[in-house]
Curated annotation (Swiss-Prot):
CDD domains on file: DEXDc_RapA, SF2_C_SNF
Keyword DNA-binding set for record: yes
Gene3D superfamilies: 2.30.30.140, 2.30.30.930, 3.30.360.80, 6.10.140.1500, 6.10.140.2230, P-loop containing nucleotide triphosphate hydrolases, Tandem AAA-ATPase domain
Protein name, entry field: RNA polymerase-associated protein RapA
Span of domain Helicase C-terminal: 473-627
Motif residue range(s): DEAH box: 278-281
GO molecular function: ATP binding; DNA binding; helicase activity; hydrolase activity, acting on acid anhydrides
NCBIfam families assigned: PRK04914.1
EC number: 3.6.4.-
Family, similarity comment: Belongs to the SNF2/RAD54 helicase family. RapA subfamily.
The keyword Transcription regulation appears for this protein: yes
Length: 948
């Protein structure tokens, strides 16, 4: 018979028990809407298979009114599908409690209900449930939660920034690291940690259109975040009243958004917790006028609590542009450009004094006076200790100065000069004769820098006349690859057509195995191409990438880069080199540059090498120089006056050297120290590497796969193939692919093989599998035979697992203070608790399975005795529960009070600490304590043990 639903009825979710009691709001066609008042969540379910259990209490049960008073049920009445409970309250007075007024925090003894209903699970499932509780508890309390699961080498400055920013309530910061230091990874880590902690649940990412794919790949590959990419086509085709409301993470191109007012209205109406804006330095602002893009981001920043701006370094931008970014974050704090300039000058002598302390290990009288003037009387004792050579005092002094830094809490900027671990670069130019076929091509951009594209565009040619038959760069490439033999080589060219033609050329003319990679391929096809290139034993020697196709991909296991042509902008040149030139690259980068002599290619090579020095070093001034000299550069690229060309290159070189000298003298070491984490990030790196070396996850996942009927077989070293078996328990297990997937637990393997899933405690497959165990009833009952000579045959032991459970919004992060670790009780016939004397694993090794029919028969025969013991077990464990809750309250209070005191003290000396941040922390503390006060003891699982 179909289930009858009525508004006001109380139900509990089988898959999300932590939501508390649900109330039926409406039944509309085939959809059922349920409100969970405890957390404020609303869910919609299909009527046919809603994962809900009706809440019904029986005479003898004790229930709670939402105002807190309790009722012992005597009689249950059904009035038009709604339950009305009659009974006695705490003063033994008769009262009535309609189910609509039940407390939203009531817990259920589902384990005992299942045991007595004969629903007894396999013995291994009980162990799986226990271990899942323990692992969940450990991860919830881990300082690495949200940081260790990224598919990247753990890098100190990135981890420091991610933890510092993500642990704030509604962070509003500027990430302005130099190129190659991983701003996108930093932003991804912040997003990931904020989502896992519940501090954010809806994230908007605004990027330039040409970076959409790069962000999509990075978020999916590195963080397993399923981002919805929005453009005009998707927005128009959506049937939803507001397409943005369906996406937890939305990736939107700013160019489209500015031109579409309807999309803007929908975006504002959707509501977001965190906004990330990439390339924020392209948002144009002047005191008397702002661009449409800047205005739109400014409006969004006024209504979205958290804002992350990713931008070029302040030195590249200039002070006015830098002020414009800070103004987006906190318009009250940064409201006056002149005042900002004056404040910046005020901090410069302090930064120089810190530089002196770091370089010399002591302070000159001038530096001493500067810092004393900045800190005031409270700095005297600290400065005296520094003068006496106290290194700890030096560290404390730097921390005091960091806290007072004008933009230290809102701006993070790391430089290559401050970060170790980058490889050297070596340049190998190869001038080649220009073939006759290229000398009379029609004028245009392609003819100048990419003659092969212009040649192909003239029309169809015979196979033996294709451009790669006569272009000397192709002969050179084949010879170079043969010389390098099995060495991995990355080839990048500007256009997809060139990449595909080069693959043909290598196959036809040399037989060298090559993989191709361009924007016309799907993400899956690119994954396969990258995996074929990465395979050391059977893979391709060379990967040929187009400019756009290679965005967002890093191949740092290779160190030879061939630029078959040169890009038109120095930023793109740096992006190409950045595919290999990353922190963690173990070899010197070998840059191979073939170019055609007496052509625009030769002059562009000279411009980049002699003018910008962009091959051997990163070029933070490249964009400014290209903009400044562009009007002279473009006409001269085509040829003409050699003297004018030499003058241009010399002028660019002089201007570059001047700008670089300015950058060096303007380095703010105080800000670099704060951004780098002053050692804190390195501790996180070591903790993550230590966690990587542990075997707890592979051991646990093997038991999880076994329980759910997932077959695993060896793929290669450190890799497994997972496939659903015929006995797969639950089709909703998050395998990721019905056909099967390849996984690895090894970070190094995952970095070189992007076609493999990198399993960590944070991976959706791991988290989803654990949720399936704990959100349902799997393993919450078991009956076993215990083989122990010390026990008389027939002796019955009862093992009970309890959990201290608090129903609260995830954003409060109460799991950190009251995690779902099992409170274990092992009762003998006399009611004695033996758990402290017999460890779980010790007991587990002595157990044997019992056929379900026999187990059920025994349970039914002992029902009254077992029910009494279960009740007694709850009484025994209650003091431990109360102490655990009290300890959680103490920890939350101590942690929140310490952070509050720090922020209040900080605000007195640094106006970048917002009132809203302090108020939010106070509210979180009060809400958290109130929710912990309602924490209940829940019976999680029962195991009946019979001595044999």
């Amino acid at each position: 018979m179909a289930q009858q639903y009525q508004p006001g009825q109380r139900w509990i979710s089988d898959s999300e028990a932590e939501l508390g009691l649900g109330t039926i709001l409406a039944q509309d066609g085939r959809l059922l809407t349920v409100l969970y008042p405890a957390t404020g969540d609303t869910r919609q379910y299909s009527l046919r298979n809603a994962p809900l259990t009706r809440v019904r209490f029986s005479p003898g049960d004790q229930i709670t009114h939402f105002e807190g008073w309790k009722l012992t049920v005597r009689e249950v009445e059904d009035i038009d599908g709604l339950m009305v409970y009659h009974g006695l309250d705490g003063q033994n007075q008769p009262r009535t409690l309609p189910e609509t007024q039940l407390s939203n925090f009531i817990q259920f003894r589902l384990a005992s209900d299942r045991l007595f209903a004969g629903q007894i699970d396999p013995l291994s499932w009980f162990s799986l449930r226990y271990n899942t509780l323990q692992h969940t508890s450990k991860q919830m309390q881990s300082a690495l939660w949200g940081l260790g699961g990224c598919r990247a080498q753990p890098i100190a400055h990135q981890l420091h920034i991610a933890r510092e920013v993500a642990d704030r309530s509604a962070p509003r910061v500027l990430l302005a690291d130099e190129v190659g230091l991983g701003k996108t990874i930093e932003a991804g880590l912040v997003i990931h940690r904020q989502l896992l902690s519940g501090r954010a649940s809806r994230v908007l990412i605004l990027v330039p259109e040409n970076l959409q794919h790069q962000w999509l790949v990075e978020m999916r590959r590195r963080f397993n975040l399923q981002v919805a990419l929005f453009d005009a086509e998707r927005f128009i085709e959506s049937d939803a009243s507001n397409p943005f409301e369906d996406a937890q993470l939305a990736l939107v191109a700013l160019e489209w958004l500015v031109d579409d007012e309807k999309a803007q209205d929908a975006l504002f109406a959707a509501g977001w917790d965190l906004m990330v804006v990439d390339e924020a330095h392209h948002l144009v602002w002047h005191e008397d006028q702002v661009s449409a893009e800047y205005g739109l981001v400014e409006q969004l920043a006024q209504v979205i609590p958290g804002v992350l701006l990713l931008t070029a370094t302040p030195e590249q931008l200039g002070q006015d542009s830098h002020f414009a970014r800070l103004r987006l974050l906190d318009p009250n704090r940064f409201h006056d450009l002149a005042a900002f300039r004056a404040e910046s000058e005020h901090y410069r002598p302090v930064a120089e004094a810190v530089q002196e302390l770091l370089d010399e290990g002591r302070l000159s009288p001038k530096a001493h006076a500067t810092i004393l003037g900045f800190l005031g009387a409270e700095g005297e004792a600290l400065l005296a200790a520094v003068s006496d050579g106290d290194t700890q005092a030096s560290a404390r002094l730097i921390r005091e100065l960091l806290d007072r830094h004008g933009t230290g809490r809102v701006l993070f900027r790391n430089t290559r000069a401050a970060i170790q671990g980058f490889p050297e670069r070596q340049l190998h130019p190869y001038p080649l004769a220009t073939p006759e076929q290229y000398r009379n091509l029609p004028a245009g951009e392609h003819a100048e820098l990419y003659p092969e594209v212009a040649f192909q565009a003239q029309g169809e040619v015979a196979d033996d006349e294709r451009w790669w038959r006569f272009d000397p760069r192709v002969d050179w490439l084949i010879d170079t690859l043969k010389m390098l033999k099995r060495t991995k080589v990355l080839v990048i060219c500007a256009h997809a057509e060139t990449a595909m033609d080069l693959e043909d050329a290598l196959r036809v003319r040399s037989g060298i195995p090559a993989s191709v990679f361009h924007e016309g391929m799907s993400i899956l096809e690119r994954d396969r191409a990258a995996a074929y290139f990465a395979d050391e034993e059977f893979g391709a020697q060379v990967l040929i990438c187009s400019e756009i196709g290679s965005e967002g991909r890093n191949f740092q296991f290779a160190h030879h880069l061939v630029m078959f042509d040169l890009p038109a902008h120095p930023d793109l040149l740096e992006q190409r080199i950045g595919r290999l030139d990353r922190i963690g690259q173990k070899h010197t980068i070998q840059l191979h540059i073939p170019y055609l002599q007496d052509s625009p290619q030769e002059r562009l090579f000279q411009w980049y090498h002699e003018g910008l020095n962009a091959f051997l070093n990163t070029c933070p001034t490249g964009n400014a120089l290209q903009h400044q000299f562009g009007p002279r550069l473009l006409p001269l690229l085509e040829g003409g006056d050699h003297k004018a060309w030499d003058t241009l290159v010399a002028d660019a070189r002089s201007e570059r050297e001047r700008l670089e000298a300015e950058l060096h003298t303007g380095r703010d070491r105080l800000l670099e120290l704060n951004s780098g984490g002053a050692g804190e990030g390195q501790a996180l790196v070591e903790a993550i590497l230590e966690q990587d070396d542990q075997f707890a996850l592979p051991i646990y996942m093997e038991t999880l796969f076994d329980a759910f009927g997932i077959d695993s077989e060896d793929h290669s070293e450190n890799a497994l193939i997972l496939k659903p078996s015929e006995k797969m328990l639950d089709a909703s297990f998050p395998l990721g692919d019905d056909e099967g997937v390849t996984i690895t637990y090894d970070r190094g393997q995952a970095l070189s093989r992007e076609d493999m899933q990198f399993l960590t405690w944070e991976h959706p497959m791991v988290q989803g599998g654990m949720d399936l165990v704990l959100s349902g009833s799997m393993g919450n009952t078991a009956v076993a035979l215990i083989k122990n000579k010390a026990l008389k045959p027939g002796t019955v032991l009862l093992e009970l697992l309890f959990v201290s459970e608090v129903v609260a919004p995830r954003s409060l992060q109460l799991g950190r203070y009251l995690p779902p670790a099992a409170l274990r009780c092992l009762l003998d016939a006399n009611g004695n608790d033996l758990a402290s004397r017999v460890a779980f694993e010790t007991l587990n090794d002595q157990l044997e399975s019992v056929p379900r029919a026999s187990a059920n028969k025994f349970v039914q025969a002992q029902r009254d005795v077992l029910a009494k013991r279960i009740s007694g077990g709850e009484e025994k464990i209650l003091p431990a529960h109360n102490e655990r809750v009290a300890e959680a309250q103490r920890r939350l209070t101590a942690e929140a009070d310490e952070e509050l005191a720090r922020l209040v003290a900080l605000q007195a000396v640094n106006p970048s600490v917002r009132d809203s941040e302090i108020d939010a922390l106070r509210k979180r503390r009060e809400d958290g304590l109130a929710m912990l006060e309602k924490a209940a003891l829940r019976l999680e699982a029962i195991r009946v043990l019979v001595a044999g």
